[in-house]
């Protein structure tokens, strides 16, 4: 129940934020290539991931075009994994980099793909309020040059990159 309440508060917060300027996204996303396991390399701190390491997101494309979302992370405080399930969708096919994600109906938040590697090896994801930002990778580590480039793009897009924290990926994962 506490987790649902936390997700509800988070989604309401995300919805209540308004962008001070437009946030450009990638022009093309092939969801069949985007689906799968992503490791969180870094993020802007947020309440729903506080104290979590080894954070992953798994996206599974459904036949109706929606995407199942499974976020997992290891709670360093509780000593166990936490997970949250949701659904994502692309509201406007002309803007495939702008998704809506819902973990608790009827609330949803923005999930904007700001940068995406041509080979779908890494991505920069944020929202127009500039309060949420993630660097994702298909592997647990990301080349330093790529990381720096993504951080520079985030900074130029108006994100407070000085607050970004790296996400540890050194946990024991019994399921992987």
PLM region descriptions:
Residues 4-14:
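Sec-dependent N-terminal signal peptides
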Residues 17-176:
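A beta-rich soluble binding module of mature secreted/lumenal proteins
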